[in-house]
């Protein structure tokens, strides 16, 4: 083979290499991933950044944001990808308080956000909805597994002149139109005002742990439920809206990255409430770093 031929092949190889590099960089444009300011959101945003980096993307993480700030940043193009909750989008962003089933909520928010250039990908099985919880020993002692069981116990004790049933809720839930009052009406029980203790959400968990409350308002995937050995009560009449965690991406970003939707859907398919509760516990109770917990999950799920 002559030097001229070798040079010719070398130039061809260089051209192919540059073309392939250019293709890789086109996919690997910088993706800005946003997250809210609580543990679950820090985990979701961090695991998304690590996962996409392993797929060849450049990523920038901007988490620790409030709900409305994150939403505004997504709409204005300052963020490319976030994880948001279907119930939040329905009630907070779109001010719809109709009682819809989980699939109806998902379809509604997806439809409403499409004209805004935002695409809701496949929802995960992580439902971080409101939930009432009890100390497990108390729940087992009184055979309470659901909100209807709770209502029946309260009504039975009231007839017998039993002791008060202290319920801990946050300040908003106690008074809002889709809060405590309508829930009591649906399940057919009524607590006296003195039995309803309004407090910071974080204090509810501590009070439940110490059995200072009979029951308290929590979030279904909070790590403290497992860490403090609390019993979640089934919402057997479907009072609370679903808050399914879902990747939301700007449509422009999806168009520039043809495989991104499929890749994020693959991640979403691996996440459910039980899994996230355990991950949240590792951060909040066991004090493990968010980045480590996120990386462990991705490896165990076979995603990286």
Predicted regions and their residues:
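Extracytoplasmic "Venus flytrap"
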Residues: 30-48, 65-67, 172-175
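Short, polar/charged alpha-helical segment
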Residues: 39-58, 181-185
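An extracytoplasmic/periplasmic, membrane-proximal ligand-sensing/linker region
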Residues: 40, 172-189, 258-304
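Beta->alpha turn/N-cap motifs
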Residues: 63-67, 77-89, 105, 201, ...
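Ligand-binding pocket segment of bilobal, Venus flytrap-like solute-binding proteins
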Residues: 160-235
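A bilobed periplasmic-binding-protein/Venus flytrap-type ligand-binding module shared by bacterial periplasmic
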Residues: 130-140, 244-257
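Ligand-binding "clamshell"
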Residues: 93-121, 210-212, 224-238
């Amino acid at each position: 083979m002559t030097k001229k031929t070798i040079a010719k092949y070398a130039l061809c190889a260089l051209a192919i290499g540059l073309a392939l590099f250019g293709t890789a960089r086109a996919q690997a444009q910088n993706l800005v991933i946003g997250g809210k300011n609580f543990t679950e959101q820090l985990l979701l945003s961090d695991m998304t950044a690590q996962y996409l980096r392993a797929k060849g993307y450049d990523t920038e993480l901007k988490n620790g944001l409030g709900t409305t700030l994150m939403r505004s940043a997504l709409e204005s193009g300052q963020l490319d990808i976030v994880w948001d909750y279907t119930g939040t989008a329905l009630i907070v962003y779109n001010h719809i308080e109709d009682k819809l089933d989980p699939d109806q909520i998902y379809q509604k928010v997806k439809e409403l956000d499409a004209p805004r250039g935002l695409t809701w990908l496949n929802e995960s099985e992580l439902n971080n909805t409101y939930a009432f919880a009890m100390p497990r020993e108390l729940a087992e002692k009184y055979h309470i597994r659901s909100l209807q069981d709770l209502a029946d116990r309260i009504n039975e004790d009231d007839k017998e002149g039993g002791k008060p049933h202290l319920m801990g809720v946050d300040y908003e839930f106690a008074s809002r139109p889709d809060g405590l009052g309508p829930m009591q009406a649906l399940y057919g029980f009524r607590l006296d005002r003195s039995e309803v203790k309004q407090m910071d959400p974080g204090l509810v968990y501590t009070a439940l742990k110490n059995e200072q409350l009979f029951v308290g308002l929590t979030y279904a995937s909070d790590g403290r439920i497992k860490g403090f050995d609390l019993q979640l009560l089934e919402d057997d009449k479907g009072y609370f809206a679903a808050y399914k965690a879902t990747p939301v991406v700007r449509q422009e970003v999806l168009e520039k990255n043809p495989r991104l939707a499929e890749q994020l859907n693959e991640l979403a398919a691996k996440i459910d409430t039980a899994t996230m509760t355990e991950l949240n516990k590792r951060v909040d109770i066991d004090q493990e770093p968010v980045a480590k917990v996120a990386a462990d999950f991705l490896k165990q799920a076979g995603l990286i």
